[in-house]
């Protein structure tokens, strides 16, 4: 399990470097774009704007892609987003959304995910986002990035080529960097505090004898609990148990 966590950290670090490169490139694109007070003209292929425009969601016909983080959870904005997404879903629009894992860590974070699902969005969760994004029908995009100078900028894009590039980045993250099970937590899986502690001790590489001693139980009882845990999480090995526990965020759940 220790090797699994080390490998996971390396993947996250590699992804972080990739995202830094993407954000830097898009940040340069933002700075080189003309700043306009009116970006509604179809001739403007890209321009820097103050914030995401929701109006294109109302006109969505085929597909909406979103990358959301806690900045998108401002109450009035989020409520309007849900309203637009639900309307699009009723029109038959496909909606896919990658949510930053940090959203789940917020108080009531899982309820935000559930509201998005109720509105018709298919949800996946990622440790890191390439950028905040709204892409509508592959012809209009809003991308928000933090450039290498730490400045947050939003770019409105109407260029078909750039929208295609953004779509490819989203698809890559959707397939390779996200989990559809990451919204599950100890609340959704019936585990006790003692079982969560055992999972954490396993993740730290502690031997059975040492774990049993620290918990004040016999090694036989410990192994029975681990076997029961494997059954609950639907796995057949301790390695799979560690992977599934991390996937369901059991290693970081709050004990009662």
From Swiss-Prot:
Entry keyword set: Antibiotic biosynthesis, DNA-binding, Transcription, Transcription regulation
Pfam families in the record: GerE (PF00196)
Matches recorded under CDD domains: LuxR_C_like (cd06170)
PROSITE patterns documented for this protein: HTH_LUXR_2
Keyword Transcription regulation in annotation: yes
Domain HTH luxR-type: 184-249
InterPro entries per the UniProt record, alphabetical: Sig_transdc_resp-reg_C-effctor, Tscrpt_reg_LuxR_C, WalR-like, WH-like_DNA-bd_sf
Gene3D superfamilies hit by this protein: Winged helix-like DNA-binding domain superfamily/Winged helix DNA-binding domain (1.10.10.10)
MF GO annotations: DNA binding
GO biological process terms held by the UniProt record: antibiotic biosynthetic process; regulation of DNA-templated transcription
DNA-binding region, residues: 208-227
Function: Involved in the regulation of the biosynthesis of phosphinothricin tripeptide (PTT), also known as bialaphos (BA), a natural-product antibiotic and potent herbicide.
Protein name, as recorded: Bialaphos biosynthetic pathway regulatory protein
Organism name: Streptomyces hygroscopicus
């Amino acid at each position: 399990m220790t090797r699994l966590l080390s490998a996971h950290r390396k993947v996250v670090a590699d992804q972080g470097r990739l995202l830094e490169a993407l954000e830097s490139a898009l940040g340069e694109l933002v700075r080189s774009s003309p700043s306009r007070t009116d970006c509604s003209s179809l001739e403007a292929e890209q321009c820097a704007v103050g914030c995401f425009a929701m109006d294109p969601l109302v006109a969505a016909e085929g597909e909406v892609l979103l990358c959301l983080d806690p900045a998108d959870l401002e109450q009035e904005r989020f409520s309007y987003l849900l309203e637009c997404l639900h309307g699009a879903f009723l029109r038959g629009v496909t909606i896919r959304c990658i949510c930053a894992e940090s959203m789940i860590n917020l108080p009531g974070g899982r309820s935000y995910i559930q509201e998005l699902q109720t509105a018709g969005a298919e949800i996946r969760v990622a440790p890191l986002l390439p950028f905040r994004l709204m892409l509508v029908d592959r012809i209009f995009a809003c991308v928000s990035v933090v450039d290498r100078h730490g400045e947050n900028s939003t770019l409105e894009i109407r260029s078909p080529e750039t929208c295609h590039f953004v779509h490819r980045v989203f698809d890559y993250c959707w397939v390779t960097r996200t989990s559809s099970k990451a919204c599950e937590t100890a609340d959704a899986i019936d585990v006790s505090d003692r079982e969560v502690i055992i999972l954490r001790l396993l993740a730290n590489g502690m031997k059975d004898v040492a774990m049993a001693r620290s918990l004040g139980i016999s090694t036989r009882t410990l192994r029975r609990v681990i076997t029961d845990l494997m059954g609950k999480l639907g796995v057949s090995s301790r390695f799979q148990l560690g992977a599934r526990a991390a996937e369901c965020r059991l290693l970081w759940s709050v004990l009662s």
